[in-house]
Each structure stands twice: as structure tokens, then as C-alpha cells.
């Protein structure tokens, strides 16, 4: 069976690359399908001119892989980081359509099924959705071929001006599954249908399977450390550094452009940094998801500096696995490293079976 994946393709975002790989891995490795991600021109490219973006990709692929240190000093951390993302992403078969906003209807003849998701493909706040909702609702494909896999809205409600777009788009799917309880409520309100809430695809892979695609970071992981990863403009972590150093921990902060070894880390290094951390502090959904995969203590921070409330994404994840007390404002310092995974591991097995049943049902219908 030949399957096309349609999702956000972002070569700067860990969670995006990892969820894309997970969907590919599940369908290809476990079900034997031929799978390819179908992408229009890359979101968040260095330049809107497609030929320049293409040139940067070629340069990063060949030059930075040969002499990464020179490339980093000469051309900056951003291109090295982007190169690491591109190189890691080679393991995800992807067909890029440069200069096209819409996927061609001709693809409908080439694939048996199309999977939309995972990630926030239906978040109307995102420029990618406003430009590519045609693709994320799979409007180029026959309705019977449309499958949504752990789709996320990233919001709790749809404003009136977007309702028709969502109703028309969602009603055309043959199967819909969502990632958050809020998404389930949105579909119920718009379509009157009950759809399953599934875990993010990254949680379908074991820690051992993720370590197979990990990479050794350029920082020392042999000493105890706390890993910080914040996507918001600011995080309420003013006390965590003091606590860490008082207790003998190094502090590693991803996205800190003052530390090239961390800032330029790709998805493979991201996996290793989480797997070896003593404690993870983050406002990122996927960072917390990987903390759970590796049974690591973690602290969840509110994401600041955003125009939208994204807490629904984390609420479902935390409530489902019994970690709703892991928000920073609910924890005392003596609870930072205490994180009981006995019930969470049992719940993960239940959720993985639900996910498997959904995929099996979809594929059997074909």
C-alpha cells in the first residue's frame, strides 16, 4: 500500500521532525507500507526566493557535513543548526514541491491513502495553515482516502469566521483522530461526531527505538545536568538555575544562541540530551512527551509571549498520564526530582493499543 503523509514540514522544530518520522516509521516499519511525506515549499525557509532556499540546502548538506566547525564559525549557528536538521531528516522520505502552495490533484492517482498529521496542522493562528489549509484538509484527494492521524488544533475553539472552512474540511475525511480533548470537543461541536483522542505518534516508539536514531551531542553528558527547552519568549525559570547549581547540576539550555554546541543541536542530539538529563524543564509539548517516553522527571512551564493559549495541548498529555501536578507553580523544590512512572507506563500501553487499533482499522478497510 502506498501512503502519502501531509504535515507541517519545519526544519527548525524538534517536535515537528520527530512526529513526522514517527508516522513514517509506524506505517512503513510496522505495517510494511510505502510511505512518503508530501510537502510544498518549506515553511520558515531562510528566504522567500525558492531557488535561494534550495541553494542554502545544497550548501548546508555538502559543506557543513564535511567541515561543520568551519561552517559554524564562518557562516553562523543558524545554517549549522539547519544543516543538522536536514541531515537527520534524510531518514524521512519526502517529496518537495517547490513554488507550489497546493498539492496537485494528480497525486490522488499515485497513492492509496493520505494521512494528515500529526502536529498542529489545523491551528488557524499559523501562517502555514492560512496558506496551506487546502493541503492539510487533503482537498486534492478523494474523500475515501483521507485519514487524520492525531491531528491538533492547538486551540480550544474555532472563531466564527473560520467555521465554514473547518466544517467543509473536516467533514470530508473518512477517518478522524485528534491529539487533544479540546480537539475532540471542536469536532463534536462542528460535525456532531465523536472522534477518538490518540497519543502523539512519537509515543508509539519505545525509548530503544528512539535511541537508534539519536546522536551524541557536542556537550558533556557524563555529568549530571538539567535540560531547559523553552519555545516561548520568556519562561518563569528564574529560580531553577539557582536550585540546579546549589544541587550540583549543570544547566543546558537548548535554543541558547550563545552556546553553539547546544543551539545547533539537531533532532538526534535532542533525543540524547533528554535521555541523559536528570531533569527537564520545558513549555514544549514534544519535549514533555519525550520526557515521558524516557521516564524522566520534568517541570512544565507556561508559555509566555504568545497571542494564543496553547495549554490544552499539554493539559491532555499531563492528565492522561497522571502528571497534572507537574506544572511549575504546583511543585515545591523537594518534588522536582520525584516523578512516579508506575501508572504512566501502564497507561502508555493502553494508549498505544488504541493507536494501533485505529491504524489497523483504517488499513484493513483498504
Please place each PLM-identified region on the residue numbering.
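Active-site anion-handling motifs in enzyme catalytic cores
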Residues: 1-366
Amino acid at each position: 500500500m502506498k501512503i502519502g503523509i501531509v504535515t507541517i514540514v519545519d526544519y527548525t522544530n524538534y517536535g515537528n521532525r520527530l512526529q513526522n518520522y514517527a508516522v513514517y516509521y509506524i506505517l512503513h516499519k510496522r505495517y510494511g507500507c510505502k510511505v512518503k511525506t508530501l510537502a510544498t515549499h518549506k515553511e520558515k525557509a531562510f528566504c522567500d526566493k525558492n531557488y535561494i532556499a534550495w541553494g542554502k540546502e545544497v550548501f548546508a548538506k555538502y559543506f557543513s557535513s564535511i567541515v561543520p566547525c568551519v561552517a559554524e564559525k564562518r557562516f553562523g549557528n543558524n545554517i549549522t543548526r539547519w544543516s543538522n536538521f536536514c541531515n537527520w531528516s534524510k531518514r524521512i522520505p519526502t517529496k518537495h514541491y517547490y513554488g507550489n502552495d497546493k498539492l496537485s490533484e494528480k497525486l490522488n492517482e499515485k497513492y492509496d491513502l493520505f494521512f494528515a498529521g500529526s502536529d498542529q496542522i489545523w491551528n488557524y493562528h499559523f501562517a502555514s495553515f492560512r496558506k496551506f489549509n487546502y493541503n492539510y484538509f487533503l482537498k486534492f484527494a478523494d474523500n475515501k482516502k483521507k485519514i487524520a492521524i492525531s491531528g491538533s488544533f492547538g486551540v480550544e475553539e474555532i472563531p466564527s469566521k473560520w467555521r465554514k472552512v473547518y466544517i467543509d474540511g473536516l467533514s470530508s475525511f473518512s477517518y478522524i483522530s485528534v491529539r487533544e480533548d479540546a480537539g475532540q470537543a471542536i469536532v463534536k461541536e462542528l460535525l456532531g461526531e465523536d472522534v477518538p483522542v490518540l497519543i502523539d505518534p512519537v509515543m508509539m516508539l519505545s525509548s530503544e527505538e528512539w535511541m537508534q536514531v539519536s546522536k551524541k551531542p557536542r556537550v558533556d553528558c557524563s555529568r549530571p545536568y538539567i535540560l531547559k527547552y523553552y519555545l516561548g519568549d520568556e519562561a518563569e525559570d528564574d529560580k531553577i538555575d539557582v536550585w540546579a547549581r546549589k544541587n550540583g547540576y549543570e544547566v543546558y539550555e537548548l535554543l541558547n544562541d550563545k552556546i553553539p554546541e547546544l543551539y545547533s543541536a539537531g533532532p538526534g542530539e535532542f533525543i540524547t540530551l533528554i535521555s541523559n538529563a536528570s531533569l527537564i524543564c520545558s513549555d514544549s509539548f514534544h519535549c514533555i512527551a519525550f520526557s515521558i517516553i524516557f521516564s524522566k522527571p520534568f517541570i512544565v512551564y507556561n508559555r509566555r509571549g504568545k497571542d494564543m493559549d496553547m495549554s490544552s495541548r499539554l493539559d491532555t498529555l499531563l492528565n492522561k498520564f497522571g502528571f497534572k501536578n507537574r506544572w511549575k507553580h504546583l511543585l515545591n523544590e523537594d518534588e522536582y526530582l520525584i516523578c512516579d512512572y508506575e501508572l504512566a507506563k501502564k497507561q502508555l500501553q493502553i494508549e498505544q493499543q488504541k493507536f494501533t487499533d485505529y491504524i489497523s482499522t483504517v488499513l484493513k478497510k483498504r
